[in-house]
């Protein structure tokens, strides 16, 4: 009698595990942050078996915050220096980065959505979305600072980088998996899409490429 092997695919285990966490730790090692790496990784990984996918991201942000400086501007400077090389700016929607790089953006969404840090936080998300989409991280800013964030979104829609333009369109989609709803008026969405598409057409015409 043949024994049937049972396999269960786990997206959370594929995306967030010891291997992916090491990529974040390796990057932090290259910054001025001085921290206990083994303790940092153990604290995160010990909790993973009891956490679902989004909860794992939230937990990594919580643990990371305990190792970063209390001063937000210093902390995001470290995170910016830890970011990997930008994604290919010519790639299309099937390329939005490795999920471990959601952590820096979510850190900024949790701790930087304030009057004091609004400008630097949005600037960070523009940079981080070139590594992993910040479409989820931008949403707390849309809810708390709708006017300022929509101005930022419109600027992103005209950016030369595909991934930044993608943030403009995906960040204001009403619904995304695991994300809070984006309360953006339909006419604002259409306006951003029109700006984005116009910019993409200009780039396509200038570069003679289909990847816009």
Language-model segments: residues:
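Surface-facing alpha-helical segments and adjacent helix-coil boundary elements at the starts of domains
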Residues: 1-212
